[in-house]
Amino acid sequence: MARYTGPATRKSRRLRVDLVGGDMAFERRPYPPGQAGRARIKESEYLLQLQEKQKARFIYGVMEKQFRRYYAEANRRAGKTGENLVVLLESRLDNVVYRAGLANTRRQARQLVSHGHFTVNGKAIDVPSFRVSQYDIINVREKSQKMNWFEEAQDNLADAVVPAWLQVVPENLRILVHQLPERAQIDIPLQEQLIVEFYSK
């Protein structure tokens, strides 16, 4: 399945969650699109589970096949499968760039990573799904630091709200991964247990 690149607001309305962050159009109409959008429709257990899976996929910009691999790995790990899944998704490099305040959306962060603007521990990485580890050091590449976008982002980093598991060094455009996130530190409106139930059928 190809990555969804259509109108983000429409997808947000269908899944009833702001997939972009700060989507004013969604806030004005937070119900599904179409004539029956406001109608109360009895949702089956399967539909609720499917919607939650789709919500996770679109929040993190992950294709179906890749999402299945994330779930399989989460299921193999010790602990709660649902929480493992969310932590794996949250540990993607594009998400870390977004969380650190170097991009306004995950979609934008994915583009910045794909265009080769970052290094991890001194090595150039252009794979958005690259999984960060504890104590990783992420830098904006020196030749990219002069770009208007990063210069503007640098000015705003001092006021950015960054998760406790990350630290941003504004003057160096550097991100430090102090630890991998715990589920309680991830502010995603997701009922991951429904995803576990979906794949357990």
UniProtKB/Swiss-Prot annotation:
The keyword Membrane does not apply. It comes from the Bacteria. One of its GO terms (molecular function) is structural constituent of ribosome. One of the primary rRNA binding proteins, it binds directly to 16S rRNA where it nucleates assembly of the body of the 30S subunit. With S5 and S12 plays an important role in translational accuracy. Keywords: Ribonucleoprotein, Ribosomal protein, RNA-binding, rRNA-binding. It comes from Corynebacterium glutamicum (strain ATCC 13032 / DSM 20300 / JCM 1318 / BCRC 11384 / CCUG 27702 / LMG 3730 / NBRC 12168 / NCIMB 10025 / NRRL B-2784 / 534). One of its GO terms (cellular component) is small ribosomal subunit. Disulfide bonds: none annotated. InterPro entries: Ribosomal_uS4 (IPR022801), Ribosomal_uS4_bac-type (IPR005709), Ribosomal_uS4_CS (IPR018079), Ribosomal_uS4_N (IPR001912), S4_RNA-bd (IPR002942), S4_RNA-bd_sf (IPR036986). Part of the 30S ribosomal subunit. Contacts protein S5. The interaction surface between S4 and S5 is involved in control of translational fidelity. Residues 91-151 form the S4 RNA-binding domain. Belongs to the universal ribosomal protein uS4 family. The keyword Zinc does not apply. Gene3D superfamilies: Ribosomal Protein S4 Delta 41, Chain A, domain 1, RNA-binding S4 domain. This is Small ribosomal subunit protein uS4. GO terms for biological process: ribosomal small subunit biogenesis; translation. HAMAP family: Ribosomal_uS4_B.
